[in-house]
Amino acid sequence: MSDKQIVVEGITKSFGTLPVVDGVSFDVRDGEFVAIVGPSGCGKSTLLNIIAGFERPDRGTVTIDGVRRTGPSRNGIMISQHGSVFPWLTVQENLMFGLRGTSQADNTELADRYIAMVGLAGFETAYPHELSGGMLKRVELARALVVKPEILYMDEPFSALDALMSLRMQNELRRILDEERHTVLLITHDVEEAIFLADRVLVLSPRPTAIQATFHVDLPHPRKLSSPQAQSLREAILKELGL
């Protein structure tokens, strides 16, 4: 059996007369972390929405685990820059909302385990308005992980946080991925974030977007962005972006 969990072939998308995605093809191995960077407005989020099943391409196909994607499925979860926590539910209730098919006691135990995993033990009964922005992002991450998705689709998940909290969340995500196996597709404007987290970085061209370059990040975790290898990779990616 192929280890290619996601296969994207010839994806093209326009909105009216505006071409946005132009023949994008790539694949993602099971358990691989792929980051996608590109100029603002180039079509990164549109491409991710197509892969996740929220948008239909004009041409091309997306195959997940050998099955052609025709819409969203429970094997993948989207985490975006926009908050998606239910404000009328507690932290624990937010995590339990998507759990089905097990007992209330089992759901509570599972929710509490993931709340602790993201460092929020003791805040189970807190409401979103009582939490900081960084804590809310931890709730979103825990709520995504508690349903045990095979794939995490992440659309600039930490971009609304301040620089220090963004770095903390990157470290938190990396720690969790060392404990649990997930395939990850990350959209980001932050080249250093891509290098810190990903196994591979795809650089997209301006709209209509296509894959302009691919970089393999052959650096062990935990990574030091100040290392000569990381700095060299950063410069190469920025050069592709015209910076």
Can you name each region flagged by the protein language model?
Residues 146-150:
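A short, proline-enriched helix->beta-strand linker immediately N-terminal to the Walker B motif
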Residues 52:
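Helix-to-loop junction immediately C-terminal to a conserved catalytic motif
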Residues 16, 56, 89, 93-108, ...:
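ABC-type ATPase nucleotide-binding domains, specifically the catalytic core motifs of the NBD
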Residues 105-123, 175:
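Conserved ABC ATPase "signature" region
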Residues 37-39:
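The feature captures the beta-strand-to-loop junction immediately N-terminal to the Walker
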Residues 127-131, 135:
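Conserved ABC ATPase signature
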